[in-house]
């Protein structure tokens, strides 16, 4: 299964990301997520963790596949090995590489 963007007919509606989400071991189902709700994505142990407003989701989708899908939108930044950040959820970027998110979380970005 691959991820893909779904563009609405009405330009005022949200663009959706359709991605296979792991429900239990060996079981996944398609999940649709508004791009505005996606905070950041990190690669961890051959899986991707999607950190969203609703919570965290895990997928076996490849990082390359998701990067190709998301980076053309200009709202996502490839922040280093295994990290995609949604600029809409960033409050501040420090010169040290620390990124302060609007939810108060701090993540480290190796690319500046």
Protein language model features and the residues they cover:
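Conserved binding/recognition cores within well-folded domains
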Residues: 2-102, 106-108
């Amino acid at each position: 299964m691959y991820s893909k963007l779904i563009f609405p007919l009405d330009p005022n509606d949200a663009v959706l990301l359709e991605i296979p989400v792991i429900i239990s071991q060996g079981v996944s189902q398609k999940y649709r997520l508004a791009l505005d709700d996606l905070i950041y994505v990190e690669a961890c142990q051959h899986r991707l963790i999607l950190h969203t407003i609703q919570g965290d989701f895990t997928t076996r989708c490849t990082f390359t596949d998701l990067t190709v899908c998301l980076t053309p939108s200009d709202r996502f930044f490839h922040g280093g090995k295994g990290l995609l950040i949604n600029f809409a959820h960033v409050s501040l970027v420090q010169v040290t590489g620390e990124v302060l998110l609007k939810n108060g979380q701090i993540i480290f970005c190796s690319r500046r």
